[in-house]
Amino acid sequence: MRSAILLVIVAIVAILGFLGVNAEPLPSPLAEPNPHAKAAPLSPAVMASLAG
Protein backbone atom coordinates (compact mmCIF):
# COMPACT_ATOMS: atom_id res chain seq x y z
CA MET A 1 0.00 0.00 0.00
CA ARG A 2 2.80 2.40 0.84
CA SER A 3 4.56 1.61 -2.42
CA ALA A 4 1.41 2.43 -4.42
CA ILE A 5 1.06 5.81 -2.72
CA LEU A 6 4.74 6.52 -3.24
CA LEU A 7 4.43 5.53 -6.90
CA VAL A 8 1.50 7.93 -7.38
CA ILE A 9 3.40 10.78 -5.73
CA VAL A 10 6.50 10.13 -7.85
CA ALA A 11 4.38 9.99 -11.01
CA ILE A 12 2.66 13.30 -10.20
CA VAL A 13 5.97 15.00 -9.47
CA ALA A 14 7.46 13.62 -12.69
CA ILE A 15 4.50 14.80 -14.78
CA LEU A 16 4.51 18.26 -13.21
CA GLY A 17 8.25 18.55 -13.71
CA PHE A 18 7.94 17.46 -17.33
CA LEU A 19 5.18 19.99 -17.99
CA GLY A 20 7.08 22.70 -16.15
CA VAL A 21 10.23 22.19 -18.21
CA ASN A 22 8.38 22.04 -21.53
CA ALA A 23 5.87 24.81 -20.85
CA GLU A 24 6.30 27.67 -23.27
CA PRO A 25 4.70 31.00 -22.42
CA LEU A 26 1.81 31.70 -24.74
CA PRO A 27 1.77 35.09 -26.44
CA SER A 28 -0.72 37.41 -24.83
CA PRO A 29 -3.75 38.16 -27.04
CA LEU A 30 -3.72 41.68 -25.62
CA ALA A 31 -0.14 42.34 -26.71
CA GLU A 32 0.18 44.82 -29.53
CA PRO A 33 1.88 43.56 -32.68
CA ASN A 34 5.42 44.79 -33.14
CA PRO A 35 5.38 47.35 -35.97
CA HIS A 36 9.12 46.84 -36.52
CA ALA A 37 8.85 43.09 -37.00
CA LYS A 38 8.98 42.14 -40.65
CA ALA A 39 8.42 38.63 -41.93
CA ALA A 40 11.46 37.87 -44.05
CA PRO A 41 10.53 35.88 -47.14
CA LEU A 42 12.17 32.47 -47.23
CA SER A 43 14.52 31.98 -50.12
CA PRO A 44 14.03 28.99 -52.44
CA ALA A 45 17.26 27.47 -51.08
CA VAL A 46 15.89 27.57 -47.53
CA MET A 47 12.60 26.07 -48.67
CA ALA A 48 14.45 23.27 -50.49
CA SER A 49 16.53 22.47 -47.43
CA LEU A 50 13.42 22.41 -45.23
CA ALA A 51 11.60 20.17 -47.68
CA GLY A 52 14.46 17.70 -47.56
UniProtKB/Swiss-Prot annotation:
<keyword id="KW-0677">Repeat</keyword>
<feature type="repeat" description="AXPX 1">
    <location>
        <begin position="23"/>
        <end position="26"/>
    </location>
</feature>
<keyword id="KW-0732">Signal</keyword>
<keyword id="KW-0027">Amidation</keyword>
<feature type="repeat" description="AXPX 3">
    <location>
        <begin position="39"/>
        <end position="42"/>
    </location>
</feature>
<feature type="signal peptide">
    <location>
        <begin position="1"/>
        <end position="23"/>
    </location>
</feature>
<protein>
    <recommendedName>
        <fullName>Venom peptide 4a</fullName>
    </recommendedName>
</protein>
<feature type="repeat" description="AXPX 2">
    <location>
        <begin position="31"/>
        <end position="34"/>
    </location>
</feature>
<feature type="modified residue" description="Alanine amide">
    <location>
        <position position="51"/>
    </location>
</feature>
<keyword id="KW-0964">Secreted</keyword>
<feature type="propeptide">
    <location>
        <begin position="24"/>
        <end position="41"/>
    </location>
</feature>
<dbReference type="GO" id="GO:0090729">
    <property type="term" value="F:toxin activity"/>
</dbReference>
<dbReference type="GO" id="GO:0005576">
    <property type="term" value="C:extracellular region"/>
</dbReference>
<keyword id="KW-0800">Toxin</keyword>
